[in-house]
Amino acid sequence: MSIYHGIIGSSDHIQNIFPPPSPRKNISLSTNNISSLTTPKNFTAIVVTKPLSQSTTSTQEMMNTSDILFDIQQPLSPQHHSRQIQQQQHEKITPEEEERRSDELQKILLDTIPILIKGVETLGIEVEQICNGDSANEKRSNCQVLVDIQKTLREYPRGMGYRSKTIPSNIVGKPKLIAFRHSMDQLVWENISKLSILKDFVEFTLDFQKLCVIGISIRDAINSFVNNKCEYLIKGFEFNNTNSILSGINIHHHLNHQPGASTPRPSHSSSSSLSHSLSSSPMSQSLPSSLTSGGVSLLNTSDDAIVPSLSSGNDDSSGSSLSSSDANVISINISTVIQNGVRDEINNTSISALKKSQKQQPVVLSRAPKQVMESTRILVDTVVNRKCMYREEKASIYREMMNDRLTLLKEDPKKFKQQLLQQRRQKLTNSDQPHETDYNEDFNLNNNSTNNNNNIKKESNGSSVNSQTTTTTTTTNNNNNNISPQHSGTSGSPSDKENSPIFSPGYLSTSPPKSPPKSPEFLGVPIGKKAHLLGHARSFSADTHATKEAAANQHHHSHNNIGSVLSPPLSSQNERILRNYKLLSSSPSSSSSAVVTNPVSLTTQLQQQQQQQQQQQTTSQPTQPPPSEYQLLDLEWEEPIDSDFILPCKGYKIDSGNSKCQQVNYDELIVLYTDEDEYHYCDDFCSLEHFNFLGVNKNQPDNPMCISVVVQHDTNELLYIIRTGEKDEKYRLSLPYGKKEISSKDMLKMIKKSRFNQMSNFKLKEVKSDQNQQFIKQLIQFEAKNIHKTFKFGVLYCSENQGTDENELYSNSSTSDEFQEFLRILGDRVQLQGWTKYRGGLDIKDNTTGTHSIYKKWRDFEIMYHVAPMIPCRAADEQSVERKRHLGNDIVLIIYKEGNTKLFDPSIIKSNFNHIFAVVQKVDPIPNVDGAAVINLGNSFNNNNSSNNNNNNNNNNNNNNNSDSNLPTTNNLPIITNVNYKISIGCKEEVQNFGPAFPKNHIFSTSTGENLTDFLLTRLINGERATLKSPVFAQKLKRTRKEFLHSFITDFGSE
């Protein structure tokens, strides 16, 4: 197992998690002489004590009966250090030992996390007592604990369902205090939610390394109480002032731990048990030391003075005089002991009392509902895996670059601005040339440093980056650039983790995942809060910069210019944002620099501006692949010379197949306009603090507008959704560098400046905070109504000699067996009474629209068929009003036609809603001269639906029984049992052409029933979506959108 290193404070202080043994210089002194010592820089004290019994009552007695061994650690040479790493890489433990330690650590965590949750709940109760500025100052340490815990658990996901607490009457009229109370209430909920989710994750996890990562986070959370002197709130630990002494103590097993040696589980507090588990296993060496060096460790509790005794077999290789089996080694920071003094007593609470107090703690369950707990565990597993693979060596390169930049900014701001301006001018001048800059240009503005960093090359054995950086970079395999789709995300299984290139050492950690599925109830907007702070979430890291650069220049930059550091893959959310949100300039093109210092020709200046705009357009949106041959054929409908089933008539188009198409490409059955099926507002805005604005055009009062804006921390951008009467527009704006705070008014000014021509005459007002919750729910419903993922298709039965009278088609109540077989291809027969899924307007209570219907769940869509013969109709009703009430409001009609005497005339359909007509007819198979049946197209495609295969077999058997006498049995012709269909598509002329295309006179076989279903549903869904884009429906949708927006302005935008 490799050892990771952490950079503590600066790059010249490196601390290993487990320091290798080194020669010691032991000096025995008494405790009374401690105050007169001056501690060297590389100085450590070793206190050798005997195991303390419960009768030990004071720290003073412990120190007086102890001997102090001062240890001067000799610095290790690089060769010695590399040998130590190689030795520890070969250390392994048996699977049984690892399983035992995992079980032990899991039990300790399950005992510790509820105590932390109870402590946070107690903090929430104390925060509720704040009623004025003085009481807020008194509770400052309690509030700081909440902030520190939130920072510790920032990367972990939270639950959903947050509700703001009511404001007490004694703070009404104090907006700052109200906002403060809301922030603290949200922190209490968020910390409890994350701790509860971690507890749930620990219950289902036995991976020791993952448990260690979570244990370190829990240790840091406990340190938040200790550092702010609020340890009395954690009742399960019974802290006292002894922590001020123990705050400088770190327990290390300097004794050589043999692989596979069992470590007895101590029967002390869960804190000391957790510390022993975290520090005694070689598995924990894979954790970065930056995670284990957070001030006071979880070892620093009152019971940590009692170290579990090691077996005597582990004392032989210690290299010191400590040979007794009951000896314990405690490394003490002498300066901390001298500063704090030995003045407190150690808590001697019995173990039974501790367990009793732990059992009394209430179990706090996760705030996330049960149906999303599995996805929540996956998010936690992603965070833990990222922490395990994080390497400080890679990030230290960027840290040095950032330090140089900040140093230059502090020393000479004027020079800093001049160099920045010079670089920007150089980029504009070279905008017509390929990009040759790399990440160093954005981070280091010092010319010398930039030149040095630009010349970094890949080295197989590692090389020094510069004189101030001690971290080395390793060679990365170029094949890692190609990441397969199945490896684009993290998986919880160890095999996926090992095989995935994302977990290779060349990759940095990705940005933290978002919370579980968003809830409309979680608003996250404190009442009265007008500003959004960015500084607390923008800690610089290499992966943040790499993500931003990859998003902006992924088609133009080569990532090999930064040595061996590769940019991490974009998260799925960032990819979706990059694909759907158009990048805008922070200032309009007309407001470009009007002052020209150098008399350059106006033509040259305009050319540079045009090149810059073209570059921005190409880099802001991913390039779309060119349409395939099949997609081009979808838009080419040939005029039928002789239509098979549909009678050509005025006002209608017919597609009976394309002569240029050779076969149906089932791999490219693409549904149109799927980019409009995403819930952008619900996914990107609802779970974050955001602002909403409403207004109308001053010159055109009938033109309303609604704007939502949120801050995207990962990319340091503002995301906008602009809703007008016509459509939703999605944009993103980059925030200026160094912008620490931005108000809602500034957000609105930025988008108005970028979209000046569109928004110059709009008067927009922010939705009030007390109405924002209800308004967000309205926006979620508004977005859901504009997403079209449920369909209702009508099905008519056309018997022989029918097709010229609409009432004849609607009056058919008895059907043939072939029609029933065709219905089984369309979907499943379901009972309507008690139906819980999409019902398509049918009655599911009283069976007034029939007892059964046909339903299909296909991809992400739901289809309910309105089968006319299955809907009850009175015999005396010649118009079949009950059936027309449903089928007449369907855009798509499927007509199953029998016989060849008459063609279907689409002009007989009187409904204005029916626009798409799919006529399907059964045809007899035509055998070849060789004696083989018609080519079965399904043989070249995989059909994985076993149930459909069984249904097809049953259908074939029924056909054998019913039509054996009609099959040819002479002339050596084979018996053919497959049923074949031919399809013709018709639509009104105002509907644009749609696909997928199919060959002329193509025959679909029942042996490929699922493929026939895929083709037919794709064609019909595309037809309905194309119809909604037609002028008639587009005008209705536009009018409906405007009515909704005007109602929002009336209800939420008034004074």
Curated annotation (Swiss-Prot):
Keywords: Cytoplasm, GTPase activation. GO terms for biological process: cell-substrate adhesion; establishment or maintenance of cell polarity; negative regulation of actin filament polymerization; regulation of myosin II filament assembly; regulation of small GTPase mediated signal transduction; response to cAMP. This is RapA guanosine triphosphatase-activating protein 1. Residues 779-1048 form the Rap-GAP domain. It is found in: Cytoplasm; Cytoplasm, Cell cortex. It comes from the Eukaryota. Residues 89-100 have a biased composition (Basic and acidic residues). Mediates the deactivation of rap1 and plays an important role in spatially and temporally regulating cell adhesion and chemotaxis by controlling attachment disassembly in the leading edge through the regulation of myosin II assembly and disassembly. Overexpression leads to defective chemotaxis. Its main location: cytoplasm. GO terms for molecular function: GTPase activator activity; GTPase regulator activity. GO terms for cellular component: cell cortex; cell leading edge; cytoplasm. Residues 76-100, 256-292, 418-525, 544-570, 603-629, 943-969 are annotated as: Disordered. The keyword Cytoplasm applies. Pfam families: Rap_GAP. Gene3D superfamilies: Rap/Ran-GAP (3.40.50.11210). Residues 483-494 have a biased composition (Polar residues). InterPro entries: Rap/Ran-GAP_sf, Rap/Ran_GAP_dom, Rap1_Ran_GAP.
